[in-house]
């Protein structure tokens, strides 16, 4: 059960960092890359 909690915490932390970097960059570049 502890392993599941630690995995969830790790994924949550990675998700928060990913969103922070994604939102830090200007949305214009992301939209242009997507098209």
Curated annotation (Swiss-Prot):
Transmembrane segments: 3-23
Keywords recorded for this protein, A-Z: Chloroplast, Membrane, Photosynthesis, Photosystem II, Plastid, Thylakoid, Transmembrane, Transmembrane helix
Pfam family, one: PsbT
Compartments reported by the entry: Plastid, Chloroplast thylakoid membrane
Membrane listed as a keyword: yes
Main location: plastid
Record's GO cellular component terms: chloroplast thylakoid membrane; photosystem II reaction center
Any one of the GO BP annotations: photosynthesis
Topology of this chain in the membrane: Single-pass membrane protein
Family: Belongs to the PsbT family.
Function text: Found at the monomer-monomer interface of the photosystem II (PS II) dimer, plays a role in assembly and dimerization of PSII. PSII is a light-driven water plastoquinone oxidoreductase, using light energy to abstract electrons from H(2)O, generating a proton gradient subsequently used for ATP formation.
Subunit structure: PSII is composed of 1 copy each of membrane proteins PsbA, PsbB, PsbC, PsbD, PsbE, PsbF, PsbH, PsbI, PsbJ, PsbK, PsbL, PsbM, PsbT, PsbY, PsbZ, Psb30/Ycf12, at least 3 peripheral proteins of the oxygen-evolving complex and a large number of cofactors. It forms dimeric complexes.
HAMAP family: PSII_PsbT
Listed name of the protein: Photosystem II reaction center protein T
Organism: Aristolochia macrophylla (Dutchman's pipe vine)
């Amino acid at each position: 059960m502890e392993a599941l909690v630690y995995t969830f915490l790790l994924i949550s932390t990675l998700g928060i960092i990913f969103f922070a970097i994604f939102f830090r960059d200007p949305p214009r570049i992301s939209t242009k890359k997507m098209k």
